[in-house]
Regions:
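Non-catalytic, mostly N-terminal accessory regions of nucleic-acid modification and defense proteins
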Residues: 26, 32, 40, 45-264, ...
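Hydrophobic alpha-helical scaffolding
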Residues: 218, 272, 307-311, 344, ...
Length: 553
């Protein structure tokens, strides 16, 4: 026997370690509740630790290690959604899973806070009224922890309750909240546009039963759930053109983070955050630093990551993705960040780091374009202006953008390249291969720059994984390892070279990828991109003619 200190989420227990207690054998498992702290033996080959109403883990006495539990649950949920008439796409699957997951998570969060308050002799005020809490309407339990199907609604009764009572009630929190960064506001925002698409109350009952099997309490559980959820987002991203708006391949994000190297205490933003992949991966990167203090961990939770997202579904996915990665109340705002005039951005809004992959080929209305000094309908170009503006002096950025930005000859492209080179040190350009973004149909580059000093030299790296990328053969971390290594010293190689600022044409500011080792890279643009540039040039010509006619009157 030996003395041991065992930690559950936000709780601890000092006790004596039983002789049978195996080492490193945690395996996420079903809930077990008890009123008294202590060890508890169960029949057969398993042992369980019970800690005052706190979910721990099944312990496998054989010491074989923990095994994934939730993968099959996610498959079961998708199987039910597949036969549901109201859900026809991968986007529907993720959307419907997300709002139910959020309510399950919210219930666990509130239960944890209530337990903490009780242990401190305080009373916790629940956010949700009792009849709208998960453990009342969705998963009422009997004493053994199983769902009480005598109390749990199903069929038309369940569907009508969700559609006519639950969702309107949750939507109402947006008006009651004290501010946009509160959990109450986020509840209202999520349910202001997200609707229940599950038409069969029996299917809804089955999905709820599966969702209730999932737990968010331990780091192992959150880790597994975050990976499963990311897999769903990836499938959605592979589903077609629209799905690609939500997913940036994670190996590319991780490589970008390794180049920019965000630090504890810095503010990180993504104002086109999609599923919050950049913010989640940045959190993982920074959280895994050794020796973080409690204060630093609190800073990571509350004062580090900020995002904005225009689309309702992406907003919900971003919130849920950050929660599963371990950020309890994400600082994500549901808004079109381009609607803010750049002149209105205050110093206290500026940040140290920007990561982003703004939408390809989007078109913004004239009134939105008025918010920017370089006016263009190209959404990505407006975002790039915003990213430069919101950075502090010395701030760093990693931005994904279409490779045609480097060479387009329209006025907006030329002016924006000039602005970037003069106001920032564009030190690195990563040229990504075709297929990096499935379904997007365009080639991309990643721009790495630091605000405050003009560009002196640009280092290029031409990424070539040596194979055709596709859905079953995507970009991986190993493909990017050489880029990350060489970028530290901006070394020349058959795939990398440097361009002095003095060699950049001062009239076009052309930054095209031209590898001196392999000749100039010919960029074959899609017909759609060519037509878009023709339309842009035509619009510029029409504007000039309009002004000339005005002068002749």
């Amino acid at each position: 026997m030996q003395e041991v200190f065992l930690v559950a989420p936000r709780h601890g227990l000092t006790g004596v370690k039983p002789e049978w207690w195996p080492q490193n054998s945690y395996r996420p498992g079903p809930a077990y509740w008890a009123t008294t702290p202590g060890y508890h033996s169960t029949p057969a080959h398993t042992r369980m630790l019970v800690l005052r109403k706190i979910l721990l883990r099944w312990i496998d006495a054989s010491g074989l290690g923990w095994k994934p539990m939730f993968e099959q649950t996610f498959k079961n949920i998708d199987d039910v959604l597949w036969k549901e008439a109201g859900c026809t796409t991968e986007l529907d699957y993720v959307e419907q899973t997300s709002w139910l997951l959020f309510l399950k998570y919210l219930d666990g969060l509130e239960q944890d806070k209530a337990d903490e308050a009780t242990m401190e002799g305080k009373k916790y005020e629940f956010i949700l009224q009792k009849q709208y809490r998960w453990d009342v309407w969705a998963a009422p339990k009997v004493k053994d922890g199983k769902i009480d199907h005598n109390k749990a609604q199903t069929g038309d009764d369940l569907r009508d309750f969700v559609n006519n009572k639950l969702i309107p009630y949750l939507h109402g929190f947006k008006q009651k909240a004290s501010g946009p960064n509160t959990l109450e506001y986020k509840i209202g925002e999520i349910f202001s546009e997200i609707k229940n698409k599950i038409q069969s109350g029996y299917n809804l009952r089955e999905i709820i039963d599966h969702i209730d099997e999932l737990e968010f309490r331990s780091q192992n559980q959150k880790h597994e759930l975050s990976h499963l959820y990311e897999a769903k987002i990836k499938n959605m991203g592979n589903a077609g053109r629209n799905g690609g708006e939500y997913y940036t391949c994670r190996p590319l994000i991780r490589a970008m983070i390794q180049v920019v190297q965000p630090k504890i205490g810095e503010r990180i933003r993504d104002d086109a955050c999609g599923s919050a992949g950049f913010l989640c991966e940045s959190f993982d990167y920074m959280r895994n630093k050794k020796g973080l203090t409690t204060k630093e961990l609190k800073t990571l939770q509350e004062k580090t990551f900020y995002g904005q997202e225009k689309k309702s579904l992406a907003y919900v996915i971003a919130i849920m993705n950050m929660i599963l990665h371990g950020i309890e109340v994400p600082n994500i705002v549901h808004a079109n960040s381009l609607s803010e005039n750049l002149a209105d951005i205050q110093d206290n809004e500026r940040c140290d780091v920007v990561f982003a992959n703004p939408p390809f080929g989007g078109k913004e209305r004239k009134e939105v374009q008025q918010n920017f000094p370089i006016r263009t309908g190209e959404t990505a170009y407006l975002f790039l202006q915003r990213f430069i503006k919101v950075l502090k002096a010395g701030g760093r950025a990693g931005i994904v953008i279409k490779n045609t930005f480097l060479s387009n000859t329209d006025n907006a492209s030329v002016s924006l390249r000039k602005h970037l080179l003069e106001s920032c040190n564009l030190h690195t350009v990563l040229d990504c291969p075709s297929g990096t973004f499935l379904g997007a149909g365009v080639k991309t580059v990643v721009l790495f720059f630091e605000k405050g000093t003009p560009t002196r030299k640009v280092w290029y790296y031409q990424l070539d994984p040596g194979r055709n990328l596709g859905k079953t053969n995507p970009l991986n971390d190993e493909d990017l390892a050489e880029f990350v290594k060489l970028q530290k010293t901006v070394a020349d190689s058959p795939k990398s070279w440097s361009l002095d600022a003095k060699d950049i044409d001062p009239t076009t500011f052309d930054l095209s990828v031209k590898n001196p080792s392999g000749g100039e890279v010919v960029v074959h643009r899609s017909p759609q991109e060519i037509m878009e540039e023709i339309a842009t040039l035509d619009a510029e010509s029409a504007e000039v003619l309009k002004r000339i006619k005005g002068l002749l009157k």
